[in-house]
């Protein structure tokens, strides 16, 4: 089983990032995924020894417009195909070669889609894909939403997702999915 922390929209909130890192102690997190806004905020996670996977956000314009940095990524974890994107749909800052999130979702190319941008945490299923927005870690521009991040526990046939709320580090949303008969993914 692999345990992954997912965060988004940190917007240079160093105190929220420190709070997040203190919550990671003892959780046996192997990887941290940062979904952008702000790309450079994630460096401190790498410095603390986490294996970092990241994509830039739309406020990371110098990175988002750099063709050497992938705005969207497809990774595999325990045989689950996971699509990483800052926005849940195409954005006017996208590069021509960027995959369009809505097309990836419509054609069921992935099992899980991780995105941020809206600051609104949630776990949903659409068109056979589990959609996860970890929310945000930005005390200044929360848009009325609490500070949240996600923990994914993934094994070959099961996905457990928890949206954790700070500063209490309490579970706000919890859902479990499994691979059903054939290729389907169903909520347990």
Roles of regions detected by a PLM:
Residues 11-15, 38-43, 59-64, 90-95, ...:
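Active-site environment of divalent metal-dependent phosphoester hydrolases
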Residues 53-109:
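Helix-adjacent hinge/juxtasegments
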Residues 1-50, 67-71, 145-146, 175-188:
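N-terminal active-site segment of His-dependent metallophosphoesterases
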Residues 107, 112, 120-127, 158-188:
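A short C-terminal boundary segment appended to hydrolase-like catalytic domains
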Residues 16, 93-98, 143, 169-178:
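A short, polar/proline- and glycine-enriched secondary-structure boundary/capping micro-motif
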Residues 1-5, 74-83, 125-131, 152-161:
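Beta-strand-turn-beta hairpins that frame and shape the catalytic cleft
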Residues 53-54, 93-158:
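Conserved beta-sheet core of the metallophosphoesterase superfamily
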Residues 6-9, 31-37, 53-58, 83-86, ...:
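Active-site neighborhood of phospho(di)ester-bond hydrolases with catalytic His/Asp-centered motifs
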């Amino acid at each position: 089983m692999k345990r992954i922390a997912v965060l988004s929209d940190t917007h240079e909130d160093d105190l929220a990032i420190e709070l997040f890192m203190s919550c990671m102690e003892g959780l046996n997190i192997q990887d941290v995924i940062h979904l952008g806004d702000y790309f450079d905020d994630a460096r401190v996670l790498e410095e603390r020894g986490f294996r970092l996977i990241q994509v830039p956000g739309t406020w990371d314009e110098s990175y988002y417009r750099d063709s050497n940095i992938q705005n969207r990524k497809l990774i595999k974890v325990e045989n689950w195909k996971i699509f990483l994107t800052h926005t849940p749909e195409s954005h006017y800052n996208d590069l021509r070669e960027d995959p369009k999130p809505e097309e990836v979702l419509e054609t069921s190319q992935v099992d899980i889609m991780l995105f941020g941008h809206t600051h609104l945490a949630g776990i949903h299923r659409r068109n056979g894909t589990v959609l996860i927005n970890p929310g945000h870690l930005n005390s200044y521009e929360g848009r009325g939403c609490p500070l949240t991040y996600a923990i994914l526990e993934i094994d070959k046939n099961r996905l457990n997702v928890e949206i954790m709320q700070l500063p209490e580090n309490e579970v706000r949303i919890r859902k479990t999915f499994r691979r059903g008969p054939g290729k389907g993914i169903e909520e347990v």
